[in-house]
Amino acid sequence: MKIDTSNFKKGLSKRLTIGREATKEYQSYFIPIDQLFFNDQNGRIATYIEEDGGEARGCLEVGNFDEYNDIIAGYIKASANDNGDSFKKTKEDIKSKGQRIPGVILDDGRIIDGNRRFSCIRELKKETGDPKFEYFECVVLPSPKTKNEAQEIKLLELNIQFNDDEKKDYNRIDFLASFYNDTRNTASPNCIDKITYCRAAGRKPAKYDDNKRVVETRLDYLEWIGKPKAFSYLKKDKLDGPLEDIAGGRKKMSQEEWNEKKNTIYSYRTFNGQGDRTRNIRAVIKDAKQDGSIYQSVNQVIENPDFLQNLPNALKIKDKKPTTPEETEERTSYLKKLQDTLDRAFIKGSKEQSAKQYREGPKNILDSVLDKIKNIHPIELRNLPEGSKNEILKQIERIEGKLEARKKACDDDLA
């Protein structure tokens, strides 16, 4: 069904930049909300559709927009970063003042801009029955017929997204799902290159590279646990923060180092459930780069042939939902043994690291002092005023006295 704007009342105009055209005003129209639906090609919404096991997709395929929109609206509200505060504020604003900012849709009913406003209007219609909430004010654009036209719509969506407060309640996983579809998913007709994305989104290349690294790490981890591209799993298991930390550690390693050490890092993150999990995984990641005591101790457990052999089964057990009390007890007991083993390895490595720091502490301090002294050039000292030279000589004498006492302490122990 194609929306014919000649049948509907005109609204405000909205400034848009589409493709290579100059920014200009586009006329908006009041379109019935029952003819509109959330854009299933949007990365964030595609994640929700993946999550629900096909119910939303089934509704969309048979044209049941109302039920489809109910499902997606529920996901949008549930995943907001601010516990729904922005949604409530927008809803109250529209209730008292009406919709003041037009959205953007395609002529097949897909919403390109205005998801929150559309959701609020739908709720207000159900709650009040007021006819004024039967319409969504929006610019209506032609649906793309070519890959180039599809990319122009995607660039418009990005441009609006990064200049619109409505999008700031996106959680990080939803944003990165969109980023993946926009920049890494070559199967998508909307996939665009780095330069084009940065220009449309107003983002610096360094930020693009950081997002790319995090997305690649998430995809790699999902592949590792046997759930390729299942972004919804990351949300369910609250893995947004830990995988950001892991991606940050990956940035400091060569590809060869990363390939060698990622199994230990992924395994520890997946099965460790003891203590301060965030602090501990950060310690393992940091230590991995230096081949330190913590990493080596954890790695020794994970690279043990028995652990490696049981890893696929352990991943299945962790992911499987128990259906009986016996299965629950068995699963809990199995995972607890793994957690205890990893926890003991972490504690052992931490103690070894502390002992090493204690042993090497004095030497590290002296190394630091020596480096600082090397930065004082003799020529600088020769050119100082007489008074300054005398002060420095006194300082040197005090330092020599302190060093002599430390040297004597070492000599006494060695005697």
Task: Describe the residue ranges of each PLM region.
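Residue-level detector of alpha-helical secondary structure
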Residues: 243, 247, 262, 312, ...
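C-terminal intrinsically disordered extensions
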Residues: 190-240, 288-339
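Short, charged/polar connector segments at secondary-structure boundaries
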Residues: 1-132
